[in-house]
């Protein structure tokens, strides 16, 4: 359905219907059990800093049960840990996770479109390089606050290509893992790719990131059908 071509009243009704559907699925016994089972197997807490653009739906794009990924949203994905409230919220999130004995993976995202630059992020005037540079600065801030050792809080920069909902992970020295260039047949090699991209990432964190990448490969394949 081309919702963008509908009258505004129909679009508002559609949005509320989506919210009701999301709420019902989130509160269902099946999804609660799926969350508990997932967290028992993958204890790393996953927080995502992202733009308020509704296309950036990480659980949907990675086939992750609802309620696993903790979002932190702002216009354009523009953040500064020097903002008092944001600093308090993020520090509180990390402290709660640490008290529960969990590591934290912070995924700092920007988004772009390969098909049309103007489907990218308006918050950065559709300048993907500027958006990525900003996420790198946020990563540096996270490391300044939570440490460079990465044993407890591990920040990564991740692009989100909105044409195919594909993840683009950035490592050090320009290394990348672009899931749009892989297929489902490459899923068994993801663990090795991650180990090469993030050699200092704790094994448990890598193991808990893997299902998101495998889910994203499956999601991309479905979009391409």
Stretches with model-predicted labels:
Residues 49, 106-110:
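Short, conserved beta-strand edge motifs with alternating hydrophobic and charged residues
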Residues 50-78:
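Catalytic core of membrane glycerolipid acyltransferases/transacylases, capturing the structured
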Residues 44-45, 68:
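A generic secondary-structure signal marking the coil-to-beta-strand transition
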Residues 53-55, 112-115:
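Solvent-exposed loop/turn segments at secondary-structure junctions
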Residues 1-44, 76-89, 94-104, 113-225:
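Divalent-metal-activated hydrolytic enzyme cores
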């Amino acid at each position: 359905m081309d919702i963008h071509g509908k009258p505004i009243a129909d679009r508002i009704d559609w949005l509320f219907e989506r919210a009701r559907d999301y709420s019902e699925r989130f509160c269902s016994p099946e999804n609660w059990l799926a969350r508990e089972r997932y967290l028992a197997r993958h204890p790393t807490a996953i927080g995502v800093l992202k733009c308020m653009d509704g296309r950036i739906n990480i659980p949907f794009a990675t086939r992750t049960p609802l309620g696993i990924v903790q979002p932190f949203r702002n216009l354009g994905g523009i953040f500064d840990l020097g903002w008092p409230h944001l600093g308090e919220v993020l520090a509180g999130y990390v402290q709660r996770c640490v008290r529960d004995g969990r590591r934290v993976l912070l995924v700092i995202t920007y988004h772009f479109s390969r098909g049309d630059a103007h489907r990218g992020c308006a918050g950065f005037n559709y300048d993907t390089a500027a958006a990525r540079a900003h996420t790198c600065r946020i990563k540096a801030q996270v490391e300044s606050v939570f440490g460079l050792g990465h044993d407890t809080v591990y920040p990564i920069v991740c692009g989100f290509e909105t044409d195919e909902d594909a993840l683009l992970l950035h490592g050090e020295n320009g290394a990348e893992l672009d899931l749009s260039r892989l297929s489902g047949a490459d899923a068994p090699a993801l663990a090795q790719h991650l180990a090469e991209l993030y050699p200092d990432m704790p094994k448990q964190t890598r193991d808990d990131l893997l299902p998101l990448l495998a889910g994203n490969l499956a999601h991309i394949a479905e979009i391409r059908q």
